[in-house]
Amino acid sequence: MIFVVKASCFETNPKTKRLLDLADFVVRGRHRIYVEDEHDVNYATWVETLPQELADDWQLALDYSVEADALEPAKLMVSICENVTSDADAIPPSLTVEDAALLGREPFRIFVENNDADRNFLLTFANLQQKRKLEDLERESLLRFEHCGGIGDVVNKLNSHIAQNPLFFKVCAAVYDSDAKSPNA
């Protein structure tokens, strides 16, 4: 996910902690962050007011974002603005800094009927590299398998999750199987 930080985020009382949280997600290899206008006066002033170590961390996140996107382009861009309310239906989606930080820390969730059985089923079909990656992401709390208890409950749990924040549908998937003895049964 690419977070594009608009100039409005630096105009009045920038949410420095949340912006630095977004930068931390980048450094951990989770997302990318760009500043829409690095020449904006308010942005330059904000960077200058940061302690040197935090300014260096911020720049590292920006540099890492360019490098990571060159190697593997992100598929979702989210615009971060402070003068609007969050709008998950906008193209691109538009979030406040607070909502972006909330979304940024959200693990990718895979909703399954039975946590252990379906998780193991997915890992069985993954090649060795994919399996290691999935296990690493799970260990780092970047991926979570959500037990739903049955096919009927998958939809309910997924809808409940998305109701918390409509943009969460971008960071989840549902996996289920058929227990039918034959196709179309």
What are these regions (language model features)?
Residues 1-185:
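Acidic, divalent-metal-binding catalytic cores of TOPRIM
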